[in-house]
Curated annotation (Swiss-Prot):
Chlorophyll a 4 binds at residue 228. Residues 1-39 form a transit peptide. Keywords: Chlorophyll, Chloroplast, Chromophore, Magnesium, Membrane, Metal-binding, Phosphoprotein, Photosynthesis, Photosystem I, Plastid, Thylakoid, Transit peptide, Transmembrane, Transmembrane helix. Chlorophyll b 2 binds at residues 105, 140. Binds at least 14 chlorophylls (8 Chl-a and 6 Chl-b) and carotenoids such as lutein and neoxanthin. GO terms for cellular component: chloroplast; chloroplast thylakoid; chloroplast thylakoid membrane; nucleus; photosystem I; plastoglobule; thylakoid. Pfam families: Chloroa_b-bind (PF00504). Gene3D superfamilies: Chlorophyll a/b binding protein domain. This is Photosystem I chlorophyll a/b-binding protein 3-1, chloroplastic. Changing residue 242 to L: Impaired complex formation with chlorophyll. Changing residue 225 to V: Impaired complex formation with chlorophyll. Chlorophyll b 1 binds at residue 56. It comes from Arabidopsis thaliana (Mouse-ear cress).
Length: 273
C-alpha cells in the first residue's frame, strides 16, 4: 500500500511538473466534461425602442442612431444629418429634431394663412381687395404690395424685432429649460415656465386645452404633429412653385383644375403638351 501511494504521488508530481513546463491545460475530470455539455438558455436581447415601426429607406448606419424614440422617426436619413459621429459638432442632432418641429408648426400656420384669404374672398366673407394671393400681400414686392397702415420697411423692422425677441426667448429656454419661468415678464412668467422639454412647453399659453393628458395620447399627438408639419412644409414649397409657374394662388389653381382637369394640370402648366 505504501509503495502504491508513493508511485501515485510520484506520478501526480511528474504530471504537474510537465504541465508547468509545457503550459498545457489541466485535464478536465469526468464530472467537469459532463457539465460542459449542459445547454444554457441564451439571454434574450433587449428590444429597441420603435423596433416594430415602419422604415423609410433606412440604412444600417441610420438605424444605429435613429432608434424610434423621436416622434415620426422611421430611420430615414439619407444625408446622415442626424448622425452624431459625422456632424463634427456643427449640427446638434437634438437641435435638428427640435428645428423640424418648430419649422413644421410655422409651416402649418403659413400654409393655412396663405390660402385662407383666397378661400374667404371667394366665399364673399371678406372684401375683394383683401382677398389676395399670398404673394401679392407684400411678401414679394415685385408681385404686388398691399397698402397697410405703415410702409413695408417699417413693418419689416417691426416684424424682425418681435420675432427676434420671441426666438431669443425660445433659444434661452433651449439652453436652460424652465428659465423663462424664473425671469419676470409682465406677470406671465408662471405660464412660460414650460415642462422641461423645450419642444413641448405646455402650460396655459402653449396647451390651453390640455391635450395629451396621458403618455399614450401625448405620444400619438406628437406623431400627428410631426406628420402634419412635414406635409405643411411640402405644401409651402408647392405654393412657391405654383405661384412662380401659374401666377395665381393655390386655391385658384385648384378651382381651375376642377373646372377643366384636362387643360389645367401639372403637365399643361409646365407646357409639357
Amino acid at each position: 500500500m505504501a509503495a502504491q501511494a508513493l508511485v501515485s504521488s510520484s506520478l501526480t508530481s511528474s504530471v504537474q511538473t510537465a504541465r508547468q513546463i509545457f503550459g498545457s491545460k489541466p485535464v478536465a475530470s469526468a464530472s467537469q466534461k459532463k457539465s460542459s455539455f449542459v445547454v444554457k438558455a441564451a439571454a434574450t436581447p433587449p428590444v429597441k425602442q420603435g423596433a416594430n415601426r415602419p422604415l423609410w429607406f433606412a440604412s444600417s448606419q441610420s438605424l444605429s442612431y435613429l432608434d424610434g424614440s423621436l416622434p415620426g422617426d422611421y430611420g430615414f436619413d439619407p444625408l446622415g444629418l442626424s448622425d452624431p459621429e459625422g456632424t463634427g459638432g456643427f449640427i446638434e442632432p437634438r437641435w435638428l429634431a427640435y428645428g423640424e418641429i418648430i419649422n413644421g408648426r410655422f409651416a402649418m400656420l403659413g400654409a393655412a394663412g396663405a390660402i385662407a384669404p383666397e378661400i374667404l374672398g371667394k366665399a364673399g366673407l371678406i372684401p375683394a381687395e383683401t382677398a389676395l394671393p399670398w404673394f401679392q400681400t407684400g411678401v414679394i414686392p415685385p408681385a404686388g404690395t398691399y397698402t397697410y397702415w405703415a410702409d413695408n420697411y417699417t413693418l419689416f423692422v417691426l416684424e424682425m424685432a418681435l420675432m427676434g425677441f420671441a426666438e431669443h426667448r425660445r433659444l434661452q429656454d433651449w439652453y436652460n429649460p424652465g428659465s423663462m419661468g424664473k425671469q419676470y415678464f409682465l406677470g406671465l412668467e408662471k405660464g412660460l415656465a414650460g415642462s422641461g422639454n423645450p419642444a413641448y412647453p405646455g402650460g396655459p399659453f402653449f396647451n390651453p386645452l390640455g391635450f395629451g393628458k396621458d403618455e399614450k395620447s401625448l405620444k400619438e399627438l406628437k406623431l400627428k404633429e410631426v406628420k402634419n408639419g412635414r406635409l405643411a412644409m411640402l405644401a409651402i414649397l408647392g405654393y412657391f412653385i405654383q405661384g412662380l409657374v401659374t401666377g395665381v394662388g393655390p386655391y385658384q389653381n385648384l378651382l381651375d383644375h376642377l373646372a377643366d382637369p384636362v387643360n389645367n394640370n401639372v403637365l399643361t402648366s409646365l407646357k409639357f403638351h
